[in-house]
Amino acid sequence: MELEPIADKLQSAGLGVKAKSIFIHAMPVECKKGILLRSPLQGTQIDHELPGYYKAQFSVICRSHNHAEAVQLANDATAALKGYNTTVGAMDVRHLLPNHLPVVFPVSEGNFIEALVKFDICFSM
């Protein structure tokens, strides 16, 4: 699935700037506070029962030096993205929903905290 419209939505919500604090597929180590969007390797499922509909998952990973700030950024991203029957870029989204609350990972080598939320999306184009 194309993650660029998701990045645009996060930028429109005031959660960062693409290529400076919102990234797709890889976040540079120099970024001290930011959001990374990643899609799984299996790609986007085609719904053969409903032609033109697709199902996918993607991850939102929020980084900060501060635990509470990383979790808050993940919660803010969740609030900006989740919903039903909306348009995101060229996608007519039936649902875009988080699977869980933020999962916080241990401090990384760069001394960062990262909080992960996985999302399900069902859409047509």
Where are these regions (language model features)?
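Oligomerization/assembly interface segments of phage tail-like spikes and tubes
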Residues: 52-68, 112-123
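Residue-level signal for secondary-structure boundary sites
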Residues: 45, 68-70, 125
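Small/polar-rich, solvent-exposed N-terminal microdomains that initiate assembly or binding
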Residues: 1-50, 72, 79, 84-91
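Acidic-leaning, charged glycine-interspersed low-complexity segments
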Residues: 81-125
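A broad, low-specificity signal marking well-ordered, structured residues that form hydrophobic/aromatic
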Residues: 34-36, 58, 96, 117
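Surface-exposed, low-hydrophobicity beta-strand/loop segments enriched in small/polar/acidic residues
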Residues: 68-69, 75-80, 100
